[in-house]
Amino acid sequence: MMNSANQAWTMYPGLSHGAYEALHAHGTDEQKALYLPKLTSGEWTGTMCLTEPHCGTDLGMLRTKAEPLADGTYKITGNKIFISAGEHAMAANIVHLVLARLPDAPKGSKGISLFVVPKFNVKADGSLGDRNPIYCSGLEHKMGIHGNATAQIAIDGAIGTLVGKPHKGLAAMFVMMNAARLGVGNQSLGLTEVAYQNALVYAKDRIQMRSLSGTKAKDKDADPIIVHPDVRKMLLTAKAYAEGARALQVFCTLLLDKAHSHPDEKVRADSDELVALLTPIVKAFVTDNGHIATNACMQVFGGHGFIKEWGMEQFVRDNRINMIYEGTNTIQSLDLLGRKVLGNQGATLKKFGKLVGQLVAEEGVNEKMAEFINPIAIL
C-alpha cells in the first residue's frame, strides 16, 4: 500500500531496512549497537553507495579508496552517483554503506570491501559528533521518482569502519541488494495495483460509443468504456499481473520467514535457497509486467492518461526505474540461469519443481481449481 501511495518516499524506509539487514548480518557488535537501534526507530536512514560514474553493473571497476588509519578506522575517498535517499533533512543522520578498495586489494570484484560511513560521525555513546566529509555534490534530474533525493556523493576523506571481512564487500552488500531486489518487485506491484484501481474506476465512469453486443446503459448517450473488449483486455491484464505478483511476493515472504525462523535447520536452508532462486524472478518478471500493466492502465484513460493532472503518467514514469536499478533485468536473467540454476546443476530448481508437483497432487482433485492446475500439470 505504501508503494501504491508513493514509491519515491517509500524508498527511504526501504533502504534503511536493507542497511539494517546488511549490518545485522555482517557488522561487528559495536556497529550493531551504534547503528541498528536508530535505523530501526527511523531516527536515522540508510543508503547503499555502489555506482560510480564509470561503473554500474561492473562493480569490479570501482575506484573509491579506503586508507587504513592507526585507530582501526578508514579514510574513504571517491565519488558515487545515483544514490537513492543520498541526502535529505528528514533524519538526524544518514548511514551510508559504501563499497571501496583497500590499498592491497586485488583487481576486480574480489578486491571490494564494504564500509559504514555516516553523514555525522557517531560517538561511542551513540551521540552524534562532527560532520563527516561525505557530501551531496549534485542531484540527478530523473524521469520519475521525483520524491526521492537521488544524489551524487563526493567522499573527501570521510571516516568509515569496515563491515565484514576485507575484500568480501560484495558478499556483505548482497544481503542488502537481495532485500532491495525483492523490494523493487514490491514497488512495481504497488504501482500496478494503484494504476489498475484508477483505470477500473475510470472505465466504469467514462462513456464512449455503444457496446458491440448492444446498448448497456440505456439512460445514457453512450456506454461505459469498460464494456469494450480492448478496454476489458487491458484491465484484466493489469489485474492478472497484480494478483500474480502479489501471490509470488507472499510466497517469497513466507519462505523468508522460514529461512529466518523455522526450527528445522534443513527447512531453513532449503527456504533460503528457494528465495535466492526466486529473487531475480521477482525483480525482473514483476517489474517487466508492471511496466506493461501501468502502460495499459494509462491507455485506458486515452488522451486523459497523457495529462499530468490525472496522475496515470506518473505511475508509468515511476515504474520505469524498477526495470533498471538494483541490477538491470537482463542481469537478473544472467543471475537466475548462471548462478541459481546452472551454479548447482539445477538442484534448487528441482526443489522448486517438487513444490509445484506437491501442489498439483494436492489440488488436482479439486474441480474448482482444475482450470488453474491443469496447465501447470502438463509443464
Each PLM stretch: what is its role?
Residues 145, 251, 273-351:
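Alpha-helix capping/hinge segments and adjacent helical runs
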Residues 1-33, 37, 41-42, 85, ...:
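Internal helix-loop-helix
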Residues 47-88, 272-288, 292-309, 315:
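Flexible, glycine/threonine-enriched loop-and-boundary segments that flank and lead into catalytic domains
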Residues 243-283:
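C-terminal helix-coil-helix/basic helical segment that borders enzyme active sites and/or dimer interfaces
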Residues 82, 121-137, 142, 149-180, ...:
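A glycine-rich, basic-preceded beta-loop-alpha segment at the flavin cofactor/substrate interface
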Residues 181-259, 345-379:
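Extended amphipathic alpha-helical segments enriched in small hydrophobics
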Residues 1-7, 16-21, 47-49, 77-83, ...:
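Glycine- and acidic
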Residues 73, 77-131:
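A short core secondary-structure module
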